[in-house]
A protein has these predicted regions:
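Short Gly/Ser/Thr- and Asp/Glu-enriched loop/turn motifs at secondary-structure junctions
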Residues: 6, 79, 138, 234-239
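Short, basic/glycine-rich phosphate-binding loops at helix/coil junctions
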Residues: 45-57, 104, 126, 195-205
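Conserved, helical-rich catalytic subdomain that frames metal- and/or nucleotide-binding sites
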Residues: 49, 135-137, 141-231, 244-263, ...
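ATP-binding N-lobe of GHMP and related small-molecule kinases
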Residues: 1-92, 110-120, 144, 154-155, ...
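Short beta-strand scaffold segments in enzyme catalytic cores
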Residues: 13, 37-41, 131-136, 141-142, ...
Length: 272
């Protein structure tokens, strides 16, 4: 069975507090984009789970951990081979690992006819990472709390988007720790207010200030893209910068920025 595992971007990411368990409270607007990894699932007779992915040890892979947990929890027969063809950059703020884990939950549910409802799948996901909870679905959403509160968010049309990744791997935990030490928490806005904002006002990311201070090359990249479009933002804790605009404008940005940074990764696609 082949399954696509779609990348996620944050159209908005505000850090609004921290709870008693030291988890950050967030207000995010997330959407999937038409850029994905491909996971191949194959049942095997031998009682073993194998995950094949370049440059990542099996035991450290979220996919392996999630699959092992579900096999134990539901006493599933035989084993499973999972091959991951990676396209989504690692440590890039695109939730590639979380998306792969969510795809695995959905795939095992389907392969073994578990008939899990969304709440049951979210409960599994919450044990491995809050980003996985949103990644179980494919619609734009307002995501709050520590990532467990999800409501559909009204975005009227699919948007053209250019992804630019500067080949920097960023550890999310480090960025949040630095944010706590240096910055104040933001005030959340009502869903109706957020849905009424135009795109330029919606696009905000509190983590940019931390990442830009540590990685000035990412700040420089954003400034250079802003010369062509105002709808530019870093996704998640970085390092990816994206721009949403008309296709003609995005093609021009791609052409001009690639002259400066030919070694960066570029993806021209659409939101889902």
């Amino acid at each position: 069975m082949l399954e696509k595992s779609y990348a996620k971007i944050n159209l908005r990411l505000k850090v609004v507090g921290i709870n008693d368990d030291n988890y950050h409270l967030l207000q995010m607007v997330n959407t999937k984009i038409n850029f994905y990894d491909v996971l191949k699932f194959k049942k095997t007779k031998e009682k073993i789970i194998n995950v094949y992915m370049k440059d990542v040890k099996q035991e450290e892979n979220l996919v392996y951990r999630v699959a092992s947990y579900m096999f134990n929890k539901y006493s599933l027969p035989g084993g499973l081979d999972i091959k991951i063809k990676k396209n989504i950059m690692i440590g890039a703020g695109l939730a590639g690992g979380s998306a792969n884990a969510a795809t695995t939950i959905n795939a095992i549910n389907k392969l073994y006819n578990l008939n899990l409802n969304i709440d049951e799948k979210r409960e599994i996901a919450s044990g491995f990472g809050t980003d996985i909870i949103y990644c179980l679905d494919n619609y734009p959403a307002l995501v709050e709390g520590i990532g467990e509160k999800i409501k559909p968010f009204n975005i009227s049309t699919k948007q053209n988007i250019l992804i630019i990744n500067p080949n920097i791997i960023i550890a999310t935990k480090d960025i949040y720790n630095q944010y706590d030490a240096l910055y104040k928490y933001s005030e959340p806005l009502d869903k109706e207010v957020l849905e009424s904002l135009d795109l330029k006002k919606l696009l905000e990311n509190d983590l940019e200030q931390v990442v830009f201070a540590k990685y000035p090359q990412i700040l420089n990249l954003k400034k250079q893209v802003l010369e062509y479009s105002s709808n530019v933002l870093m996704s998640g804790s970085g390092s990816t910068i994206y721009v949403i605009d008309e296709l003609k404008t995005l093609k021009k940005i791609y052409k001009e920025i690639k002259k400066i940074y030919p070694e960066y990764k570029y993806v021209l696609t659409k939101t889902r």
